[in-house]
Amino acid sequence: MEFHHIPVLLEEVLEALQPRPDGLYLDGTVGGGGHSAAILEKTAGQGRLIGLDQDPRALAAARIKLEKFADQVTLVRSNFRQLGSVVEELGQKGKIDGILLDIGVSSHQLDEAERGFTYRAEAPLDMRMNPDGAVTAAQILNEYPEGEIFRILWEYGEERWSKRIAQFIVNRRTEQPLASTTDLVDVIRAAIPAAARQEGGHPAKRTFQALRIAVNDELGALQEALPAALDALAPSGRLAVISFHSLEDRIVKNFFAEQAKGCTCPPDMPVCGCGKKARLKIITRKPITGSEEELKINPRSQSAKLRVAQKI
């Protein structure tokens, strides 16, 4: 299958990173290579780029997309949470001029129904971005305690019917394990009252999102990647993060705010005793969102938020 993925907020990312001919850039979620190709084009074909992705199919697609930049690109199969060790192994720690993290599932992964990311087609309950990952959605649904399933749905999906859905999942699995996306959708439809099913899009949307985040430990990966990205940047280098979920955006916002703080000593202290210095300058006080034009072309950009900061 051809890897189809439209890069979100592309012009905004280029404006944020301001690629230059002698620059070194890192795309922590290279996907189909759309953002990476545009970054390299902006460097007049002279810049260098390190591309990471844990999905081997995405990496193969990126290799094709970036073929004309082959001499300037280093592609590594790795989760972006390991970007610190990748950069260190390549001898580039503290030398990266711009880093992009585009968090979440790609449109291509959603299109590959057999991977179980979408509630619109029947497939095994997998949801792993890395096919070698340890835990599948089926294992969570069939093996985790009811309380833990409730927590996942409530925290990661912000699903108001989390408790009922978790109860219905456990009741169903005592009779027969949940094996397919259709099994899960049927349980969700049964758990959510009929009137509530008519609200806010597909009734399974939040549950599928929550399971995907849990299976891939997306929030944990982001929390590890942000400090590693800051260390990897050169002075004045920029970090651009695109998130699609309020929890992810909150993590990015709080990290930027914390790293932008300087001395925390009381105002009446004559000399700083804490030694804390700001490491980041926030470029986007409010997240950048997609234009009306982009929303028409790429519906995925509807929930996309871009935050940018610069290393001091």
Swiss-Prot record:
Enzyme class, UniProt record, top EC level: transferase
Pfam families assigned: Methyltransf_5
GO terms, molecular function: rRNA (cytosine-N4-)-methyltransferase activity
Subcellular location: Cytoplasm
GO biological process, one term: rRNA base methylation
Catalytic activity: cytidine(1402) in 16S rRNA + S-adenosyl-L-methionine = N(4)-methylcytidine(1402) in 16S rRNA + S-adenosyl-L-homocysteine + H(+)
Enzyme Commission number(s) from the entry: 2.1.1.199
Gene Ontology cellular component list: cytoplasm
Amino acids binding S-adenosyl-L-methionine: G33, G34, H35, D53, F80, D102, Q109
Keywords: Cytoplasm, Methyltransferase, rRNA processing, S-adenosyl-L-methionine, Transferase
Similarity comment: family membership: Belongs to the methyltransferase superfamily. RsmH family.
Function field: Specifically methylates the N4 position of cytidine in position 1402 (C1402) of 16S rRNA.
Record's protein name: Ribosomal RNA small subunit methyltransferase H
Lineage of the species this protein comes from: Bacteria, Bacillati, Bacillota, Clostridia, Eubacteriales
Gene name for this UniProt entry: rsmH
